[in-house]
Regions:
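Conserved SAM-binding strand-loop segment of SAM-dependent methyltransferases
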Residues: 233-246
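Conserved beta-strand signature within the Rossmann-like core of class I S-adenosyl-L-methionine
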Residues: 284-292
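A short glycine-rich, Lys/Arg-flanked "PGG" loop and its adjoining helix->strand segment in the class I
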Residues: 271-283
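Substrate-binding/catalytic lobe of Class I Rossmann-like enzymes that use SAM or dcSAM, i.e.
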Residues: 292-403, 417-420
Length: 457
């Protein structure tokens, strides 16, 4: 071995030694073997059940990058090939390194970095032009790409795995139904869908009897397909889709729903978001906001996700969300926390993506596909092992806008769509049918896919 080779080997060995305390802190399940470029090895055995994974680091600098910015460095290393999984899968690796995330918080560098990240996040907001740019970057990738792993209704948000759901399609249909129960859409009502995606929920609400549904989005790709789907379903007049920022809305709506959009708003714009709901919701109206959240105090953004997946995005805590709702004077009539439902959803997406990976490579390059593998697997494990969850907020102007108890959420649809009294009369939630779509100012029961470390994808 030459002197230069010995120097490189020493740097790799030094890097692995520096990495060892951090790995011991976070690996609380399974066994991880880290191989340096010159065959130096580090083995971390948790002594607890879990996957056995071997990874190879192809750069002497990588251990130090992993220590300084773990999330960003790990994601980029996998994308670029400077970290390869020699035994197991990226999903296995992420299951191991997220098994003890509390230990990461105790490392000195994390104690220094976390407060700075929180301060920077407080300033995060998305003005109109920036919001449109950020949305386009993610959602305008290609409808053909999203079709590779989404269900047949194009639902790109957490499914609802109720008893009897045997597939992703079933669980996404259950999600639409569950949100519909909370909205209590009656015949002739007007509905606003903020961040309507590819139109699945809006079209479903039109089918349930809504006279007019306006879906708004900042993604041209989504809007094009949503309009096409409404036309094909025969509901093009009832379900309309516009390119519009929620801050530019006009009119009043009996029902307002927003699924998977609040994560893109940013703390500095929370007031604008809930003010829009307060101003555009009818006096007897009901709104439902469905969002990824963190079961922890407000924190920072994930640097890898912010750079590569959702620029400008931020996962809100329930506390910072509700404090803004309170200032708007809205009643929080129901809160539901979905704990593992998104982990199961992401597991389905990951398996579907892997099974159609060759198709993805026809659309994008290998680095892009590795990025999405990492994204789907990392998100799944953060719902399984981290502090992520989903919350659904039901909001209203009046305390009696919805029934006194939650039985109506689980009653057969024909009994709960519009609650009635003993005489068959509509209760408070029966807003009168008003055509207010005035346009815009600028045109847990089913056996789950539990992760047991057996994935070979």
């Amino acid at each position: 071995m030459t002197q230069r080779q010995r120097g490189k080997s020493a740097r790799h060995e030094l890097g692995l030694r520096a990495l060892k305390p951090a790995l011991r802190a976070v690996v609380k399940a399974g066994r991880l073997t880290v191989i340096g470029a010159h065959a130096t090895r580090l083995v971390i055995d948790s002594g607890s059940p879990g996957p056995s994974v071997a990874i190879k680091l192809h750069s002497a600098a990588l251990p130090f990058k992993l220590l300084s910015r773990p999330s960003l460095a790990l994601g980029e290393a996998y994308m670029d090939g400077s970290l390869t999984v020699e035994d197991g899968s990226i999903r296995d690796l992420l299951a191991i390194v997220t098994s003890g995330l509390d230990g990461l918080d105790e490392l000195p560098i994390e104690r220094l970095r976390a407060p700075l990240a929180r301060i920077a996040t407080r300033l995060t907001g998305n003005r109109r032009r920036k919001a449109a740019r950020n949305v386009a970057r993610h959602y305008d990738l290609s409808n053909e790409f999203y079709a590779l792993f989404l269900d047949e209704d194009w639902q790109y948000s957490c499914a609802y795995f109720c008893e009897g759901c045997s597939s992703l399609e079933d669980a996404q249909a259950a999600k639409r139904s569950h949100i519909g129960q909370k909205l209590m859409v009656g015949e002739g009502m007007s509905v606003l869908d903020i961040g309507c995606g590819w139109g699945g929920l809006a079209i479903e609400l039109a089918k349930q009897g809504a006279a007019e549904v306006l879906g708004i989005s900042l993604s041209q790709e989504q809007l094009t397909l949503a309009r096409q789907r409404a036309e094909e379903a025969g509901f093009a007049e009832e379900a309309r889709f516009d390119f519009c920022d929620y801050r530019d809305l006009q009119g009043e709506f009996d029902r307002i729903v927003s699924v998977g959009m609040f994560e893109h708003v940013g703390p500095a714009s929370y007031g604008s978001f809930f003010r829009a709901i307060e101003e555009h919701l009818a006096p007897d109206g009901v709104a439902v906001v469905h969002s990824i959240g963190r079961m922890a105090p407000p924190g920072g953004k994930d640097p890898w996700v912010d750079k590569y997946i959702f620029p400008g995005g931020y996962i809100p805590s329930l506390s910072e969300t509700l404090s803004v709702v309170e200032r708007m004077g809205l009643w929080v009539t129901d809160i539901e926390i979905l704990r593992l439902h998104y982990a199961e959803t992401l597991a389905h997406w990951y398996e579907r993506f892997q099974s159609r990976r060759e198709k993805a490579l026809e659309l994008f390059d290998e680095r892009f596909c590795r990025m999405w593998e990492y994204y789907l697997a990392a998100c799944e494990m953060m719902f399984r092992n981290g502090n992520l969850m989903v919350f659904q907020l039901q909001l209203a102007h009046k305390r009696d806008a919805v029934p006194l108890t939650r039985e109506y959420l689980y009653a057969p649809r024909d009994q709960s769509a519009v609650p009635r009294d003993a005489g068959g009369n509509h209760l408070r939630c029966s807003c009168s049918a008003r055509s207010r779509l005035l346009g815009t100012s600028n045109s847990e029961g089913v056996p789950p896919m539990r992760y047991d470390g057996s994935s070979t994808s």
